[in-house]
């Protein structure tokens, strides 16, 4: 990151940690100093960690895997939802559904249930239900949408998860650890960074700080997605060229065979003529 970008982190208040008495000693390598009873993070280290996370997440996006964003705290949920939608990534901003990762098959069934209800409404089946049944189905659909609507496109386990506040999202952390899913996170001075694979030491309480970090991460993922699109388009063009080349070869082969058949017919005709002359 450039000097300007570090200044942007400073302006966003990314460096403000928690009260010194609430600190986790494992965050010591990322702390610059203590001021008025509050720990101040070293933004150069934060910038380096953001860069590291960006590169790794860009690769995951380029591979076609999904990155699941998790942020249920009030000051983070709207920000995370907005950026996730922009880059078409799944996110959880309501209560974490237990077994979201470790019992993914059941979660997928619940998501499919939403699809079934939507189909009922399209094909007219919904109208055959009684008033009470319609109300029950609508309530079920609303509840599913609230908790799982943001992960409908996640057809398999994510390639990584990105968390805001690992203390709050401890269940998500445990599930990801159990399945060896890489964990990226904004980690404040009151949290244990050892639980995370890619630590971004940062203020995970202020909306301005969260917005800055998530924005930088989303940009990197967006770049990965753009590169993937370009690669896919190039592959399709290459496949079309190969298809055309195969067609050309087939046409040439057919022409050669046709020429050989004609030549054989001419030779055959000449032989018949010679036989007639001899007679």
Can you annotate each of these PLM segments?
Residues 172-230:
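Short glycine/threonine-rich loop/turn motifs
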Residues 90-196:
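Long, charge-patterned amphipathic alpha-helical coiled-coil/hairpin "stalk" segments used as oligomerization
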Residues 1-7, 223-279:
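Intrinsically disordered, compositionally biased charged tails
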Residues 41, 70, 163-165, 186, ...:
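Conserved beta-strand segments of the P-loop GTPase G domain that flank and frequently precede/overlap
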Residues 1-66, 72-73, 77-120, 131-134, ...:
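N-terminal cationic and glycine-rich segments that engage phosphates or anionic surfaces
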Residues 13, 69, 161, 213:
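Residue-level signature of catalytic and energy-coupling elements of molecular machines
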Residues 46, 72-73, 166, 189, ...:
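Short beta->alpha junction loops/turns
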């Amino acid at each position: 990151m450039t000097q300007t970008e570090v200044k942007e982190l400073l302006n966003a208040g990314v460096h403000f940690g928690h009260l010194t008495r609430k600190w986790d000693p494992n965050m010591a390598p990322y702390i610059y100093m203590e001021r008025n009873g509050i720990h101040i993070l070293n933004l150069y280290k934060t910038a380096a960690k953001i860069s590291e996370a960006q590169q790794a997440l860009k690769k995951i996006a380029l591979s076609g895997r999904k990155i699941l964003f998790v942020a249920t705290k009030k000051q983070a949920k709207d920000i995370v939802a907005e950026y996730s939608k922009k880059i078409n990534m799944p996110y959880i901003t309501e209560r974490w559904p237990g077994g979201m990762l470790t019992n993914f098959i059941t979660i997928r069934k619940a998501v499919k249930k939403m699809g079934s209800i939507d189909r009922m409404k399209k094909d007219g089946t919904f109208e055959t239900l009684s008033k009470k049944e319609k109300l029950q189905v609508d309530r079920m659909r609303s509840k599913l949408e609230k908790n799982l609507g943001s992960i409908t496109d996640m057809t398999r386990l994510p390639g990584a998860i990105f968390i805001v506040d690992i203390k709050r999202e401890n269940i998500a952390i445990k599930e990801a650890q159990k399945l060896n899913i890489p964990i990226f996170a904004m980690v404040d001075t009151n949290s244990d960074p050892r639980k995370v694979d890619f630590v971004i030491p940062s203020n995970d309480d202020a909306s301005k700080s969260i917005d800055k970090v998530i924005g930088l991460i989303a940009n990197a993922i967006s770049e990965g997605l753009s590169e993937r699109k370009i690669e896919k388009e190039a592959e399709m063009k290459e496949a079309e060229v190969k298809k055309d080349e195969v067609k050309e070869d087939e046409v040439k082969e057919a022409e050669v065979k046709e020429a050989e058949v004609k030549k054989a017919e001419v030779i055959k005709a000449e032989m018949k003529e010679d036989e007639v002359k001899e007679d």
